[in-house]
């Protein structure tokens, strides 16, 4: 791969986007230096000049062939979890182990990838956990549709703390959660609501979602905004963290079925469009949308996740694969899942790894960058 001044091509391409991002916002280029993009403006101009050189066009064409994204540098591995678990979501812990919701057995699961050993923690009678994330306290937090509650599990003692929804919310069909930068947990319920939980005092506030049922995926951006997607409503929404009110943002394709959302490092919101078979992105800087048709026959994009290199990962039920999308080259790369009809419903990662839950096979899957 081409290297310039110690930067690999993907880094240069991302730097080019960063430079364009800054230009679009009319920020003085000197700010780039103070934000550690690079040390000197002259180096920026040299780098951008290199990016626009014809030699890069040649290299770019080479980079986007069948071996684009250097897919051969990645390995894919599955980990078996107890039968009947039907894992729905995964959440890597700081120590490299993996939490997962065992929706089929009403438990929280834990996998040590170095040994393959799993353990399960019971969450209570009627539990049907959907989402799990690791909070700022390093503990797993679960959205449990069966218990109609948010559940925190102590990662050391396995002690559970249940935050039940208000009694007037009979069944929220709890889905996914995210922490904002103030430590407030925001969550969605497909029955037609979203809410906030203050872990410090246990207070929960519920809001009715626009257009009724549908709230599904939710994400926090680097600048602290919180967005959720509505599958039935076919929109994404930005939440005002003070009032709880939302601004609806509709993708260009009608009835597209926005299912999950994730933010990249530029605060852009990536959307898996279940009904339309597209990958969408919303840019809050200029309030613009873009969409790409996912390759293959009748694609069904479910999960979406953006890694530390701003590469976008999608699970596709139709092709039984995970896809990696480069937003600068606008190219997809495909990783076929080893087990047929895996149904990966959620993706999350840590440095150099992307994890998914195979809800139909009682397995977790990892894509890992080789050294």
Segments and roles (model prediction):
Residues 63-83:
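A short helix->beta-strand "capping" segment at the edge of beta-propeller domains
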Residues 107-109, 149-151, 193-195, 235-237, ...:
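A short loop-to-beta-strand structural motif that recurs across blades of beta-propeller domains
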Residues 112-116, 154-158, 198-202, 240-244, ...:
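Short loop/turn segments that connect beta-strands within beta-propeller blades
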Residues 99-104, 142-146, 185-191, 228-232, ...:
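Conserved beta-strand positions in repeat-built beta-propeller and related beta-rich domains
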Residues 83-94, 125-136, 168-182, 211-223, ...:
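Beta-rich, blade/repeat-based domains predominating
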Residues 343-371:
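Blade-level signature of beta-propeller repeat domains, shared across WD40, Kelch, NHL, RCC1
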Residues 2-19, 44:
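Short, compositionally biased, intrinsically disordered N-terminal export/targeting signals
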Residues 77-80, 117-122, 159-166, 203-208, ...:
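A short beta-strand motif characteristic of beta-propeller blades
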């Amino acid at each position: 791969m081409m290297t310039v001044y110690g930067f690999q091509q993907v880094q240069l391409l991302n730097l080019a986007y960063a430079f364009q991002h800054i230009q679009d916002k009319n920020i003085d280029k000197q700010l780039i230096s103070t934000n550690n993009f690079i040390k000197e403006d002259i180096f920026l101009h040299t780098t951008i000049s290199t990016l626009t050189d014809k030699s890069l066009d040649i290299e770019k064409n080479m980079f986007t062939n069948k071996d684009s994204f250097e897919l051969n540098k990645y390995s894919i591995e599955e980990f078996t979890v107890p039968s009947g678990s039907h894992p729905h979501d995964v959440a890597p812990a700081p120590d490299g182990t993996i939490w997962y919701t065992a929706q089929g057995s009403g438990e929280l699961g834990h996998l040590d990838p170095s040994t393959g050993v799993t353990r399960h923690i019971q969450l209570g009678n009627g539990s049907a956990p959907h989402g799990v994330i690791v909070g700022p306290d390093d503990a797993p937090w679960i959205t449990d549709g069966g218990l109609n509650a948010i559940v925190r599990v102590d990662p050391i003692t396995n002690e559970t703390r249940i935050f039940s929804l208000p009694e007037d919310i009979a069944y929220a069909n709890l889905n996914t959660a995210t922490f904002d930068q103030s430590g407030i947990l925001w969550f969605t319920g497909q029955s037609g609501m979203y809410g906030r939980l203050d872990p410090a005092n246990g207070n929960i506030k519920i809001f009715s979602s626009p257009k009724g049922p549908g709230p599904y995926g939710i994400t926090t951006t680097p600048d602290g905004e919180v967005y959720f997607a509505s599958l039935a409503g076919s929109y994404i929404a930005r939440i005002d963290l003070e009032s709880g009110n939302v601004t609806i943002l509709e993708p260009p394709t009608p009835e597209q079925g926005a299912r999950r959302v994730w933010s990249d490092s530029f605060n852009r919101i990536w959307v898996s469009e279940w009904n339309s078979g597209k990958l969408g992105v919303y840019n809050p800087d200029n309030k613009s949308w873009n969409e790409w048709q996912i390759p293959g026959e009748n694609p069904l994009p479910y999960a979406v996740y953006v890694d530390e290199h701003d590469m976008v990962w999608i699970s596709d039920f139709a092709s039984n694969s995970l896809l990696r999308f480069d937003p600068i080259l606008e190219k997809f790369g495909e990783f076929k899942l080893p087990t047929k009809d895996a149904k990966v419903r959620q993706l999350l990662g840590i440095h150099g790894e992307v994890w998914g839950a195979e809800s139909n096979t009682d397995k977790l899957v990892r894509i890992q960058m080789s050294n």
